[in-house]
Amino acid sequence: MESKLKINGIEYGSRFRGEDPRVPGFTESHFKPPLRVMFVGAHPDDPDVRCSGFARTLVEAGHRVRFVALCNGDKGHQFMPSEEVGRRRYGESRKVIATLGIEDYIVADNPDCEVEPTLENRRWLTRVIREFGPHIIVTHRPNDYHCDHRATATLVQDATYLVGVPLWCPDAPVPEVIPTVLFMGDRFTQPAPFRPDFVIDVSRHEDVIVDTFACHESQMFEWLVPEHGYSLADVPPADDVEGRRRFIRKSALHLVADYARAFDEAVAKAYPGRNPRLVEVYEKSEYGRTPVPAERSLLASLGGVWLDSVQSKWTQVK
């Protein structure tokens, strides 16, 4: 007969097998590589545009990476019907798996422009997180420009705590680690400007970043072209692969390169005398777990630099 969890003489059922399923505190002794990192964006191109360099760095070093999109992106086009856009963008996410070498790209079936922090979405994301058990989740800041981005940020922060609550979604086992949450870089200043706590030089991955962008044909060569300052007549034909790579470099690669300019002081502090051309920047959320020294050291060994600006006096309060 299975033992039951007893607290103050009350039995709480056999599913716990006599043990509290939660880890009391994630320490050095709990951390065992490879690192598991989950990039959670609103649309099936958000993690790619902002984080593909970091993702590729992790994959090359043998760590586990998954991408997640909270909606199917079916409104991201000026001509095609939504149903066709959604199918097409799902296919583009499959190309990203092969290009970046990530494990999976999970795309939720929420319509574009309709992501909300509902109970249904919170449960769905909790199960996705628990199944993978990431050490780190990367997502949008709650004050990003798109309503879907803001809702995704809220969902991640809500789910991050609930991941460790056994009676929430009890069908999905609680993982041994509550994730650290990092925010992708952005340019917004209200209610607070982005704070670059972790900086990583991704210049050596420029070709892979360009090819990852190019996987999203419906976006980079159609929908976003006017937003990037070009017309559809400027886009090379689909069979001109090198021409399209050159077009990405002049029309869209600034989405990565601009971070080096916007956060030049942080980049100079992280890489004195180096002046890297392509960097990605991340802010540590106050939600989630603080990385243990072994995780910080591992990321540093990959070329990342922690600037520690997130530390506050609360870390000294016992």
Model segments located where?
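C-terminal accessory domains and tails appended to enzymatic cores
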Residues: 2-33, 169-170, 177, 192, ...
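Histidine- and/or cysteine-centered catalytic micro-motif in compact active-site loops
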Residues: 142, 186-187, 205, 216
